[in-house]
């Protein structure tokens, strides 16, 4: 259902629009962890490692595709705000064609390079076969995974964040049920997890298409599917920098994981657990980024620039409030949180140190996440790409390496490096915002 996000209370809009985002992201994260949990219950280390490594590769591919799709979300949102029905439908049509072609190309390339990918990930010898089979099935299913994410991006551009939440709930339900059937009953190991993932995404797409047809949400004719240079350019101008940024962030996570792995199995385990915890805590700023992008895109379309800045301000306050709460809470109960995931005292000790430092990132990241969403709505997603690259190259990766060498007995300094990177990103974002505002770049 199309919704006008430029009317009513700006605060109420951002809360009601971001909440389904948050729930959808939570389900998506839970969905990813379900595979690991169920495989771990029924199979050995080789299968678990295969799914873990394979899902990491698939997550990188997915976030990069979703990053490009953000271009569609923003452009559709603008045309909704401008009341340009023809351009809106053409953007939807072009999005469908572009990503159909892109998903097929990506699938063929990944299948061709599957063995080098498994090798680059430093896959243990025992897990190579399981990882390869898992990735092969998931790569074949990329068109379905892409279709789900594209449909969700279109709905969000139309101002509907609830429907994508329902779609991911469908995928989550089928994934868990199929995992128990394929892995628990048929003992299919990592292959079962892969089939469960692909089939559940397909079921989600079928439900989404059924909803679109039944409710007549998007009426597309053949001429809307004709590729238009300007529309394609606009989508990639916004989406490509986000895609590259998200891909680079995932690469930095892999590098930091490699650094942690070099410090021994206990530290590697501690860092792995904390990364999972942080992924949950970051659902709030991540959801706020997406919500601000969609809402502000409609505001740009109606030239309600003051309302767009008001949305940014409310988003920052909400995300910052949650970030401060998480940061303070984890300083006092970090060991208790770690004990939910492991009973090994040494892992809890290292994990507690790492979490106390890392959780501060929730405070500062909440600022630059919100600004990134705002910049994206105005078509300046390149700013988000630049500040993230600077942060990763200058602080996050070298900081993790240097602190691992200077402080071998503790993980606290290594945990602080992401927060330091986010402080730099926040400073860059605020500075650029002030400069661009003075030049009336947000009032055209």
Describe the function of each predicted region.
Residues 48-108, 145-164, 270-334, 365-387:
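Small-residue-rich hydrophobic transmembrane alpha-helices
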Residues 43-56, 135, 194, 265-280, ...:
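Small-residue hotspots at the loop-to-helix junctions and early N-terminal turns
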Residues 5-42, 56-71, 75, 100-107, ...:
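N-terminal transmembrane alpha-helices
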Residues 69, 138-156, 164-172, 193-206, ...:
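Short runs within selected transmembrane alpha-helices of multi-pass transporters and secretion channels
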Residues 22, 26, 30, 34, ...:
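Generic alpha-helical transmembrane segments of integral inner-membrane proteins
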Residues 16-35, 137, 171, 200-204, ...:
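Transmembrane helical elements of multi-pass membrane transporters/channels
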Residues 30-49, 118-125, 181-188, 247-274, ...:
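Helix-terminus/linker motif at the lipid-water interface of multi-pass membrane proteins
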Residues 1-18, 76-141, 185-240, 296-361, ...:
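Short alpha-helical transmembrane segments in multi-pass integral membrane proteins
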């Amino acid at each position: 259902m199309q919704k006008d996000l430029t009317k009513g209370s700006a605060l109420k809009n951002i809360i009601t629009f971001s909440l389904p985002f948050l729930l959808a992201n939570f389900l998506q994260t839970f969905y990813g962890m379900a595979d690991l949990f169920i495989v771990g219950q029924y199979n050995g280390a080789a299968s678990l490692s295969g799914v873990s490594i394979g899902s990491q590769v698939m997550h990188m591919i997915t976030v990069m595709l979703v990053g490009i799709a953000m271009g569609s979300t923003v452009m559709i949102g603008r045309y909704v705000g401008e009341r340009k029905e023809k351009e809106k439908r053409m953007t939807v049509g072009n999005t469908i064609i572009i990503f159909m072609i892109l998903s097929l190309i990506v699938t063929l390339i990944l299948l061709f390079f599957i063995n080098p990918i498994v090798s680059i990930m430093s896959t243990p010898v025992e897990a190579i076969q399981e990882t390869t089979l898992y990735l092969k099935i998931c790569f074949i299913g990329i068109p379905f995974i892409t279709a789900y994410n594209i449909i969700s991006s279109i709905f969000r551009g139309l101002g509907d964040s609830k429907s994508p939440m329902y779609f991911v709930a469908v995928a989550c339900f089928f994934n868990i049920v199929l995992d128990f059937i394929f892995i628990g009953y048929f003992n299919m190991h990592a292959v079962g997890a892969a089939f469960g993932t692909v089939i559940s995404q397909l079921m989600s797409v079928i439900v989404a298409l059924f909803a679109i047809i039944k409710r007549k949400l998007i009426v597309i004719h053949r001429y809307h599917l004709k590729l238009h240079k300007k529309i394609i350019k606009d989508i990639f101008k916004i989406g490509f920098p986000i895609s590259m940024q998200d891909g680079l962030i995932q690469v930095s996570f892999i590098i930091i994981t490699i650094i942690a792995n070099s410090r021994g199995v206990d530290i590697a385990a501690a860092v792995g657990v904390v990364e999972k915890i942080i992924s949950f805590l970051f659902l709030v700023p991540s959801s706020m980024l997406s919500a601000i992008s969609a809402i502000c895109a409609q505001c740009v379309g109606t030239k309600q620039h003051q309302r767009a800045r008001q949305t940014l301000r409310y988003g920052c306050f909400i995300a910052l409030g949650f970030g401060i709460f998480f940061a303070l809470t984890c300083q006092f109960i970090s060991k208790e949180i770690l004990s939910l995931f492991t009973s090994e005292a040494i892992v809890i000790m290292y994990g507690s140190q790492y979490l106390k430092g890392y959780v501060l990132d929730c405070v500062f990241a909440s600022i630059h996440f919100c600004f990134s969403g705002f910049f994206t709505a105005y078509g300046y997603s390149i700013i988000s790409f630049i500040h993230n690259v600077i942060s990763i190259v200058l602080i996050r990766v070298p900081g993790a390496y240097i602190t691992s060498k200077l402080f071998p007995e503790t993980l606290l300094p290594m945990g602080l490096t992401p927060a330091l990177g986010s402080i730099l990103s926040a400073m860059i974002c605020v500075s650029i915002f002030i400069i661009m505002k003075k030049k009336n770049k947000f009032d055209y």
